[in-house]
Every structure is written in structure tokens, then in C-alpha cells.
Amino acid sequence: MGLLSDVINNFLPETPLAWAALILASFTLYSVQLVVRRLYFHPLSKIPGPFLARSRYWYEFYQDIILGGIYVKNYAALHEKYGPVLRASPDRVHVSDPDFFHEVYSSGSKYMKDPAFFQAAGGIPEALPAIVDVEYHRRRRKLINDLFSAKSMEALSHLVLKVVQNALSKAHEHHEANKVLDIQRLYTGITIDTIMQVLCDRTLNFIDAKEEEEPPFLATLRTFSENFFLLKHFPILIWMALNIPKSIAQKLIPGEFEFRASINQWIRDRASEHELGVEKAEDGRKTVIDLLLRPEDGGRPLTHQAVEDETYSFAFAGTHTTSHTMSMGTYYLLSHPAKLQKLRDELKPIPKNDQGLYEYKTVRSLPYLNACIKESLRMSSPVPGILPRLVPAEGMTWRGHYLPPGTSVSSSIYSVHTDPNIFPNPEQFIPERWLANENLDHYLVVFGKGSRACIGLNVAWMETYLTFSNFFTSLNMTLFETNEQSTDWTDCGNAMIKKHVRVKVDSLAS
């Protein structure tokens, strides 16, 4: 024992400087072996990519956080240099190939969601977008699927039209007061007040809120978007935020606790109404919360946490994505007067209702309106980044590169939407491309594909049909301090532009 002690004492450094040298040497050796292993002995060692991306996670961290969410924009240049199959980080592969997108994300795909991404960044593990297990996801989605069918949209359309009418009134007020209109915030009001009707048959009256106010919901949405990649790289921050003293957490994530409290109150209110035998909205509709509390298939109700997570998720997913698309569509159309006039000409002969508004059933099939919306969706790509999946047990080979089981793979929506082989001049707003080639619909992947596609896509389409048709024929607008620079976006889970789209309502259209 004494001999062993002497050996240890002789080996250990005797001074602080020697200790520092030992620690530095150990760290250096560890780092070198880690880099060597990832470059030459890793299952993905033969996949091409930048040296730093293949060897260190810090490369992705740098793109996501230091440079502010621009990795998805840099994929094109990297793929041009390294080929269609790119090692974007030590354990993740990005593929720039629209056919690969459909291979991975379409119905019947064996590629499961990557839990390291979907379970980590959102903090809502029981919400549909975060559920990894395919069968559990199928059962959960089935509970509410009928609410989002085309038939259900007809029943909901009169409520959405009322919301749009209220927003138009707000735009009229800005015209009369000669005030600049933050139309992106107004569109956000349309989407929030609509999704609240779907969730729990109520409205937050966001359209009527003062522009200088930031309600708890918006504060939460902004904070989450600004910190999306920080939470992705350091998911422990979510746990910390939810477990530190409330007084501190409220400063770090403003609005979060107030919004969560509102959600819980909505759930309790609906549960109380169920106990009194009231299980539908006043107009006979069932809401998302209704069906989650009392499934129509006779199954067990979800836990309170699951209902809360689902409600939270719907509120987020159903708000920014659509308002961003409508805002950017407004920017594109106001920047192209001839195309805006073409849209107005198509709408002019369409009959309006007694309130002088276009209805969903009369405009949803108009070719040029659809083309304008599709082009707005393509160019704005509200969720532009990666949605990783895991290669199934049998592995796969793509473009000569073998990807072993469990590899995290992705193909970003933005990469598909800007592929010049499919969309010539992808940076230009050309609605006519959708009229000339019906096959392009296959490559409009903004809502995803298959059983994992966005469940609320019909709601988003309806909101946009009603907003575009009524706003562009009721108002004459010009852009205010909104241009290519102000609408430049970064990936924050959602696409976030530098400044909101703002307009002046010059006159009311006759």
C-alpha cells in the first residue's frame, strides 16, 4: 500500500502550474482522439462535409446561435461543394434532394422522428408534433382528425370570416386615422382568434388589443422563437426554466406562466361544462379540448398534462406560421402591382355575401388566388429548417452513400422550395408557375407530407383564402418601410423576419 502511495505521489504534479499543464494535456488528448474517431472511425466517416461539421458539434452551434439561425440558408453552397448528401454535424446528415424528402416524410415512411430534436427543444412532450412513436401518434391524431376535415372547414368558415371582418374594421380605423398599420400583427390576430375558436370556442380578442401591448401569448411565442436553438443545443435549459423560482422564470420567459395559466383555465372551464352536459360549442361544433377530454371513440381521456401540451402546441403552430405566410404574401403582392391587379380581376366577378365579403366556398377554387397563396407559401417557407428523422433498422443507401440504422437525417423544406431544377428563378415571385405545371403541387412541402403532415393545414388555407380575397379587394395599400432587407429572415424553428411587414392603407377600394 505504501509503495502504491509513493508511486501516486511521485506521478501527481506538485505545483498548480503542473496541475494546469496536466489538465490541458488531458483535454487536448481527449479532443484529438474524439476528432480522429469522428473523422475516420465513425459510421458516417465516409459522408462528405466540412471538417469542422464532421468533427465538432460546435460548427452547427456556431451556425445556429452565433450567426443566428442561418445554417439552412448555407446548405445550398455546402451541397454544391460536397454533393447532395452532406454530413452537417458529427451525427446528422442533410440531403438536398426533393425525392429524398418524399422518401422520408411521406405516408408509410419507416423513418421515425428523431427524439433528440422533437422531444428536446419544445418542452411539450405530449403534443402531437413531439410524439415519436408512430402508433401512439396515429391514435392521438385520430381523436381530433375530423375537426380539420374539409367538411368541418365549412362549419368553421363563418367564424373565421367574422374574425377577418373584425380585422378589416381595424384596418379601416388606421386609414381614417392616417396611421401606419402593422399588418403582420393584425394577421397574427386573425390566426390567434381563429385557433382559439378551434381549441376551445373562445377568442382572445387579440385584434382589438393595442399595438404597443404584448399579451402573454405573444411574449411566450417571441421568447421561444428567439431561444429555439439555444433550447435545441441545451435542452436542460427547459427543465431549469420550469423548476427555478417563478419570480426568476417570469423574467427569463415572460408571459409563459400567464399563458400556461390561461390554458389550464380553458381546460377546467370545458371540463366543468362537460360535467353539466354541455360538450359542444354554441354552434354545435366540438373543439379540440372537447375531444381530448372525452374521446368520441370511447377511449380513455388524456391526462391533464397531455391536454395542456396539445393546446399549447396548437396555439403556437396555428399562429405564427400562417400569419408569416400572409404577411410575406402581402409584401410580395404589393411589390408586384401587376400580379395584384391580376388577382383583383379574378375576384371581381365573384359574388359577395350580404356584408360585402367573399366567402370561403366561393373563392377556394379560384386558380390565380390559389397560385398566389402557393407561391407565398413556397417563398416564405414558414418552417424552413430541418425536421430530423431516423434511418430505419435496415439502413439505406442514397446517391451512393450508405446511411446506417439510427442515423439522423433531414431534408429541409427551404431546400426543396428553392431547388432551381424544380422552381426556375426560385428567388422570384411567380404565381404563374403554379398554373403552368400541375405537377409542382407535389413539391409544395410546407405542411409536410403523409400522416405527419400539419393537421391544421385546412385551417391555414381557409384563413389565407378569406384574408387575401377580402383584404386585397377592400383596401388599397402600399408598403411602409418594408423591403427586401427588412423581410430577410432567420431560422428560429419558424422563419422570423427582421421587422414586421407594415403598410399604409391609402384608400378603401370601391
UniProtKB/Swiss-Prot annotation:
Alphabetically ordered keywords of this record: Glycoprotein, Heme, Iron, Membrane, Metal-binding, Monooxygenase, Oxidoreductase, Transmembrane, Transmembrane helix, Virulence
Pfam families documented for this protein: p450
Transmembrane segment boundaries: 16-36
EC assignment: 1.-.-.-
Recorded phenotype for the gene knockout or disruption: Abolishes the production of 10-beta,15-alpha-dihydroxyprobotryane, botrydial, and of some of its relatives.
Molecular function GO terms recorded: heme binding; iron ion binding; monooxygenase activity; oxidoreductase activity, acting on paired donors, with incorporation or reduction of molecular oxygen
Subcellular locations according to the entry: Membrane
Bilayer topology: Single-pass membrane protein
Pathway(s) of this molecule: Secondary metabolite biosynthesis
Amino-acid positions noted as binding heme in the UniProt annotation, renumbered to this chain: 454
Family: Belongs to the cytochrome P450 family.
Function of the protein: Cytochrome P450 monooxygenase; part of the gene cluster that mediates the biosynthesis of botrydial. Botrydial is necessary for colonization of plant tissue by the T4 strain. It is a strain-dependent virulence factor since highly aggressive strains like SAS56 or B05 still retain substantial virulence when botrydial synthesis is impaired, since they produce also botcinic acid. The first step of botrydial biosynthesis is performed by the sesquiterpene synthase BOT2 which catalyzes the cyclization of farnesyl diphosphate (FPP) to presilphiperfolan-8-beta-ol (PSP).
Name this protein carries in UniProt: Cytochrome P450 monooxygenase BOT1
Underlying gene: BOT1
